[in-house]
Amino acid sequence: MKIYLVGGAVRDSLLNLPIKDKDFMVVGATPEQMQQLGYRQVGKDFPVFLHPKTQQEYALARTERKVGLGYGGFSCYASPDVTLEQDLLRRDLTINAIAQDEAGNLYDPYHGIADINARQLRHVSAAFAEDPLRVLRVARFAARFHDLGFEIAAETMALMQHMSQTEELTALTPERVWQEVDKSLGGPHPEVFFEVLRQCGALNILFPEIEALFGVPQPEKWHPEIDTGLHTMLVLAQASSLTEEKAVRFAALVHDLGKALSPKEHWPKHHGHGQKGLPVIKSLCERLRIPNEYRDLALLVSDQHQNVHQAFELRSETIIKLFDKADFWRKPERLEQLLLACIADMRGRTGFEHHAYPQGDYLSACFSAASSVDVKAIIAAGFQGAQIKQALNSKRIEVVEQVKLNWQQSQTKQTP
């Protein structure tokens, strides 16, 4: 019986990255032997055990055979006669197929160390094509290790393109697709994840709403990058540099889905695209079972980002209506999230990457003033029932109007 550290822990150690989780593989043992040593079995489909003290996972060496569609269509064979090389052969990428024994010796039968040094994401064997989830995993690794210079090997990209032309991707469950997307949204370069999916042809299958944005033009005056799909990737990249909140990043990704619905004869204009995108976002979120937190913010950003961009032109009444509709009174954090997404939208344009966004400061000042209106004072003044709400609304409009005047005066003073 031999124990090896495998997978991400070995890879990240070689890359001098912090190690989050450790996975171990056991060669030459039976489930009964593991249980006699105090390990507790938790795997249903194949033998995985928890260490009696550390609770880390130890899996018996195994091979896999394709028996059906999807990432779950495998039959596993675990036995003491399965070798280290056989187990590593079933893994996705060579950089994930390196093992380390208890003495610290490395075992690298598929040249993963060479690929780490060459910064290549390369599949271990042709069996890679049997698991459609690996298309998403490779896209996620490309995004995760983008700053380290990793690229997808040409033969691996060709295999991913072939896989995207089969029915395998459609067999993925919504939960597994979203799990990979969510992990990517939490990484440093989620835009690379979607760019890779587009490059291999998977974006059109898994996210046709996003694929539809590519090739849709925008006015060059406001969008030097012109293409809506490219703009969307730039916005997602900007959102990722502004915040680690995955809900904001998702909202940035889907804020312009309505532009794909604009009639071609109206191009490059997209009147009402924010509202047109709402049912598209709802459908996408329902299909992939995306959390309500993400969906609600995405709907808000799509619906209101044009208003936020035009904040200085809005009447005070309209600003209060925006605050009411978004329910900022009960959820003030959503204002900051909305503004972050709008800053990303503004900066996600070629040549605008470092521009200021005074609309954000202005709306924050408006909300701060409106929030300071004292309801108790209104009640003390004798207002009752529906009159309280009306008086509160009027007072909020009044204080926002004052903010508006102050802002205009400050801008006038700054103008030479």
Swiss-Prot record:
Please tell me where CTP binds in this chain: G8, R11, R91, R137, R140
- List, separated by semicolons, the cofactors it needs: Mg(2+); Ni(2+)
Q: How is the cofactor bound?
A: Magnesium is required for nucleotidyltransferase activity.
List, in alphabetical order, the Gene Ontology terms for molecular function in this entry: ATP binding; CCA tRNA nucleotidyltransferase activity; cyclic-nucleotide phosphodiesterase activity; magnesium ion binding; phosphatase activity; tRNA binding
Which superkingdom is the protein from?
A: Bacteria
Q: Which residues are ATP-binding?
A: G8, R11, R91, R137, R140
E.C. numbers: 2.7.7.72, 3.1.3.-, 3.1.4.-
Q: Which residues bind Mg(2+)?
A: D21, D23
One GO biological-process annotation of the entry reads: tRNA 3'-terminal CCA addition
Q: Where is the HD domain?
A: 228-329
Q: How does it assemble?
A: Monomer. Can also form homodimers and oligomers.
Q: What is recorded about the domains?
A: Comprises two domains: an N-terminal domain containing the nucleotidyltransferase activity and a C-terminal HD domain associated with both phosphodiesterase and phosphatase activities.
State any further remark: A single active site specifically recognizes both ATP and CTP and is responsible for their addition.
Q: What is this protein's function per UniProt?
A: Catalyzes the addition and repair of the essential 3'-terminal CCA sequence in tRNAs without using a nucleic acid template. Adds these three nucleotides in the order of C, C, and A to the tRNA nucleotide-73, using CTP and ATP as substrates and producing inorganic pyrophosphate. tRNA 3'-terminal CCA addition is required both for tRNA processing and repair. Also involved in tRNA surveillance by mediating tandem CCA addition to generate a CCACCA at the 3' terminus of unstable tRNAs. While stable tRNAs receive only 3'-terminal CCA, unstable tRNAs are marked with CCACCA and rapidly degraded.
Q: Would you tell me the protein name for this molecule?
A: Multifunctional CCA protein
Organism this protein belongs to: Shewanella sp. (strain ANA-3)
